[in-house]
Amino acid sequence: GLLKQGYPADKIIVNDPNEEKRAFFAQYGIAVSTDNEQSITQSQVVLFAVKPQVLANVCKPLSAVDFSDKLIISIAAGISTARLAELLPTAKSIVRVMPNTPALVGEGMAGLFADKNTSEIDRTFAEDLLSAVGKTTWVTNEAQMHAVTAASGSSPAYFFQFLEAMQQGLMEMGLDENQSR
């Protein structure tokens, strides 16, 4: 989404322990690394797109890094801005984001919440960044992110269940499997 919106690949660094994923991003001219600390040191914005259960392990070796001049964006479901601040003690600007699955094809919806220390400039950057993969909406109370997470995680499943029921109904009315799709 970012590259399609014209964001320069040379402004992005992707850190991933998986060699195949690094190769995938490298083919688009994106810098890749396995050294989180080095990448973070040279970045203004740090996006944590990891499973919530591994976030603490990712952050632990970074606790001594100075995040005071960086925007932290987290896509780790259920991890509060307070918890992120505990994991990254020097972080001043933290935004939680919960995109839904259609974001993978640029048609998503993302809920955002910013902690009280996040500047308007950082809020705007986070919103612009997420707008590259769909629409955005800000919530004013972090507890509302639970509802956003539930909707983001569940709504695609309900939609596909609805489509399967429609297909089954059409097949019961005489259409074959291909026609009912």
Model-identified regions with their sequence ranges:
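Membrane-interface segments of envelope glycosyltransferases acting on lipid-linked substrates or membrane lipids
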Residues: 1-6, 78-81
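NAD(P)-binding Rossmann-fold cofactor-contacting core
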Residues: 5-26
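Conserved H-loop
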Residues: 8-9, 33, 68, 176
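Small-residue helix-packing motif on alpha-helices
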Residues: 12, 22, 39, 176-181
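Rossmann-like NAD(P)(H) cofactor-binding subdomain of soluble oxidoreductases
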Residues: 19, 25-28, 36-48, 52-112, ...
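Short acidic-hydrophobic, aromatic-tinged amphipathic segments that line or gate anion-handling sites
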Residues: 31-36, 138-139
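Internal alpha-helical scaffold of NAD(P)-dependent oxidoreductase catalytic cores
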Residues: 83, 87-93, 109-147, 158-181
